[in-house]
A protein has these predicted regions:
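Membrane-interfacial loop-to-transmembrane alpha-helix junctions, especially the N-terminal start
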Residues: 51-63, 108-121, 167-172, 240-241, ...
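A membrane-periplasm/extracellular boundary helix in multi-pass inner-membrane enzymes
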Residues: 181, 189-190, 255, 272-312, ...
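Aromatic-anchored transmembrane helix interface
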Residues: 86-96, 113-124, 135-157, 176
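Loop-to-helix entry and N-terminal half of a specific, functionally important transmembrane alpha helix
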Residues: 244-246, 366, 385, 392-422, ...
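Alpha-helical transmembrane segments of multi-pass inner-membrane proteins
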Residues: 10, 17-25, 43-48, 99, ...
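A juxtamembrane structural motif centered on a specific transmembrane helix
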Residues: 1-20, 228-229, 399-402, 423, ...
């Protein structure tokens, strides 16, 4: 193939330079002079170069930094044709594209068995997009769900054995350094100045609850790193990680997120009962010690008051949740029970069916109620099938790594616990970390159940 003449190359370069020169002022104007927005384009170019160089390296870098991404991504959003687009959406697109290309390059590693319930849930969600009262919001929500599946599938290409699972664990642990440091800064600047009674730590995340759920995941993986014989830590790293755990627990308390407290306590209780019962006494003392903290005590005592139904201001958060769940479920008509009202419908119709909404589009704060309302009984059945299949697969990991299997199943249980009281499906960064860990654990489990396929690659891989 003959290369183009020098004149053509020169002319093409001049046209590209002219186009870039004309576009830059328009780009700067669209970014409203914001330094962060102006840096979005160079950052996008770096992502594109990494995408061409090594897609798995790009995915690892995204996961390493995504926990601190909400601060930046929120400031890069711009309105184009009435649709809000930001750098975060472009990163999501890269993640989905990475998964597509990984599967296309090596389809034999695609986890068919666990992908079936995922596909059922995504199909139910896609039907929900078609029925959605707000198409733009529904498409964004669906792309978020699709990115969770993309991260989960990518783990099967990232992890080829127990060694890679350890790398995945370390990656998530390292991702917590920036949020932890930022949280300490936030505490020093705002918490101590205004008092801790009404202070809720959110760090780099958009809401304290998301930070709390992320911390429970990091604490779980810290436990694995400290106790697993598969991870060899130097004395210095072991000391640092051991000191890091109490810091994370302190940050978790400062989020004031009760469901995360319950999930974290349940995880450590299960670990103590199954692995090290000598710590049971310390575990029983932990709630009593936590109640000595004024903010924790107030959050717990708050559940005993404000249960009368008058208005949102006079309801505690749990009583308010019970009310919105009841009104939402009672509003579902029998003909809408199979397929629901469409993706994003609960939030859209909340001011209609919930008399205490005050005109605010509240989320369900319970993904089981949300899925039943939006995707119907079929969507909820697909969701239940997905988690049942995951539980079945993760049990097999115990043959390879008993503690690793416990950590993965505990993460599954944690996810189900917090899903009963929050809008977990909307928390993108947290979900990415959950699904990369679950995908990595499933990859380890499946790698041990297909020895014949490993010996004879022509017969396929993880199915």
């Amino acid at each position: 193939m003959q290369s183009p003449p020098p004149a053509v190359l020169t002319g093409g370069a001049l046209l590209v330079a002219l186009a870039v020169g004309l576009a830059l002022p328009l780009y700067a104007q669209a970014m409203s002079g914001s330094a962060v927005r102006l840096l979005a384009l160079p950052a996008l170019l770096v992502l594109a170069i990494l995408f061409l160089y090594d897609r798995l390296v790009l995915l690892a870098l995204v996961l390493l930094l995504r926990a601190a991404g909400d601060l930046v991504f929120e400031t890069t959003r711009v309105e184009i044709g009435g649709l809000a687009i930001g750098f975060g959406g472009l990163v999501n697109a890269f993640v989905i594209l990475i998964a597509v290309l990984l599967v296309a390059a090596r389809p034999e590693r695609f986890p068919t068995r666990v992908a079936a319930p995922w596909a059922a849930f995504l199909i139910a969600a896609l039907i929900g997009v078609g029925m959605a009262p707000n198409l733009g919001d529904a498409v964004r929500s669906y792309l978020g769900l699709l990115s969770y599946f993309a991260v989960f599938v990518s783990a099967f290409y990232f992890v080829r054995g127990e060694g890679d699972f350890k790398v995945c664990v370390k990656l998530v642990l390292l991702s917590s350094l920036l949020p932890a440091a930022y949280g300490l800064g936030e505490l020093a600047l705002h918490g101590l100045a205004g008092g801790l009674q009404a202070f809720r730590l959110k760090s780099t995340f958009s809401h304290p609850n998301i930070f709390a759920f992320y911390l429970t995941l990091v604490l779980l993986l810290s436990l694995y790193a400290l106790k697993s014989p598969a991870i060899a830590l130097t004395p210095l790293r072991r000391t640092l990680l051991t000191a890091y755990v109490p810091l994370l627990l302190g940050l978790l308390l400062l989020t004031q997120t009760r469901s995360a407290w319950v999930a974290c306590f349940a995880i450590f209780a299960l670990y103590t009962l199954l692995f090290e019962r000598r710590y049971l006494v310390y575990l029983l003392l932990a709630p009593a010690l936590a109640l000595l903290v004024p903010g924790v005590r107030e959050r717990v005592l708050d559940l005993g008051s404000g249960n009368e139904v008058v208005q949102y201001a006079k309801l505690n958060s749990f009583a308010w949740r019970l009310q919105i769940w009841e009104y939402g479920l009672r509003w579902i008509r029998p003909e809408n029970l199979p397929l629901g009202y469409g993706l994003g419908a609960f939030k859209h119709f909340a001011p209609v069916f919930f008399p205490y909404s005050g005109g605010v589009n509240f989320g369900a704060h319970n993904i089981y109620v949300q899925i039943l309302f939006e995707l119907g009984a079929l969507g909820l059945a697909a969701f239940a099938w997905l988690f049942a299949r995951l539980f079945s697969m993760l049990r097999r990991m115990a043959v390879v790594d008993r503690l690793g299997a416990f950590v993965a199943i505990a993460l599954l249980i944690e996810y189900l616990i917090i899903s009963a009281s929050d809008n977990v499906l909307a928390y993108l960064a947290f979900n990415w970390y959950v699904w990369i860990v679950l995908g990595a654990a499933c990859a380890v489990a499946l790698s041990r159940t297909a020895p014949v396929a490993a010996a004879r690659p022509t017969q396929g891989g993880t199915t």
